[in-house]
Structures are given as C-alpha cells and as structure tokens.
C-alpha cells in the first residue's frame, strides 16, 4: 500500500488471532481514492490468497479478514459510489471488447460472492448498514466484483513472488515476530513486485 509502512509481522497467538501484519499510514489522511481502497482490500485478502497459493485451499482462520474485506467493499459501493478498477483484457476470437470485459467481471463476481461474508442481516438504515448495502442486488454485484478483483490481484501477487514470500515466512517461523525497521529491511530485501495480470490466461485465476 502506498503511503503505508509495515510495523509488525507476527505469528504469535493473540486474542484468538493466529497471525498479524500491521501497517500504518506515514501521514494521517481523511479520504482515500478508489486505488487506495483497492490496495487495502488486496492487503486484507493477502493471507487467504497465500494459503491458496501454498496449500491449494484456505483455512477457517481467514474469517476475520473476510469480514473486514466484505465490510470495506460494501462501504466502497454503498457509501462512496465506487466500482471495480479499470482493467485490460484481450477479447477472444468471437468476442467484442465489451463482451470480454463482462466475461471478466462475471468471474470477479463469482469469486467475490464466495468470499463475501453473509453472517448477519439488516437494512440500509438499521444498526447494520453493511448488510443493507449487500441486500441491494446491484450494490451486492458491485461489491462482489470488487472483492473478486482484489482477491485475484492478491493471488497473482503471491504467486508471482512465491519464492520471496516463502523466504519471509521461513524467517518468521524462526523469529515468531518482527517489528519496525527490521521488518521494513526484510520486506525491502524481498523486492516484491506486482505482476501484469493476463486475464485471458487461466493461470491468472485461482481455483475456488
């Protein structure tokens, strides 16, 4: 996430949490653009994506991440008029550009609906406005697309940097917890990079 710095990476159990990555903004901000919010979603779904890359499935330990990511996506579409980020996709031989875009959005939506937390109910003006947003068909569709897009980005990020991520994990297994400047040095040394995602390739799509 741009403008944020990692402050703690831990696998010590705290309050039922089996792992924790903390990142704080370098400067206080009162608003964020869609790209900033999407980066936060990719971060939130990173652990789930890593489980998928390394183990081929996710555990029930991602419940908290799923809940917070769902709330964020719902807030983005319900209160901030946001939708999925722009993306480039190569049409198939019998497709128009619009049809190719719709095909990708449907795959985002399918993935996002599986990720989406739906353990509570509510209306738009009740104590649970997030559930109210998700009860609206159009908003629910957009929230699912955003979640799916963020998860695909997180999955490809981990897959592209798999060896570096594994080195970081091995270091953490030994040390259990890393803080501050030492953590920043470890992450900088890993040289993680964001890949260009080819949505026309099946390799880019996680198996859910």
Which stretches of residues belong to each language-model region?
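Soluble catalytic regions of large protease machineries
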Residues: 1-208
């Amino acid at each position: 996430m741009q403008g944020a710095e990692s402050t703690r990476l831990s696998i010590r159990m705290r309050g039922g949490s089996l792992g924790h990555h903390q990142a704080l903004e370098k400067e206080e901000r009162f608003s964020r653009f869609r790209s900033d919010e999407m980066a936060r979603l990719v971060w939130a779904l990173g652990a789930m994506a890593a489980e998928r890359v390394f183990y081929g499935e996710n555990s029930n330990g991602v419940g908290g991440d799923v809940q917070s990511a769902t709330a964020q996506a719902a807030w983005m579409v319900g209160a901030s008029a946001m939708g999925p980020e722009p993306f480039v996709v190569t049409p198939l031989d019998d497709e128009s550009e619009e049809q190719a875009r719709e095909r990708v959005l449907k795959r985002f939506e399918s993935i996002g609906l599986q990720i989406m937390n739906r353990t509570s109910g509510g209306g738009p003006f009740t104590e649970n406005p997030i559930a109210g947003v998700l009860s609206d068909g159009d908003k629910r569709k957009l929230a699912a697309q955003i979640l799916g897009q963020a998860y695909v980005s997180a999955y490809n990020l981990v897959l592209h940097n798999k060896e570096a991520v594994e080195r970081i994990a091995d270091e953490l297994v030994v040390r259990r917890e890393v803080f501050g400047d030492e953590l920043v040095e470890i992450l900088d040394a890993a040289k993680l990079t964001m890949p260009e995602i080819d949505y026309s390739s099946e390799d880019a799509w996680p198996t859910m």
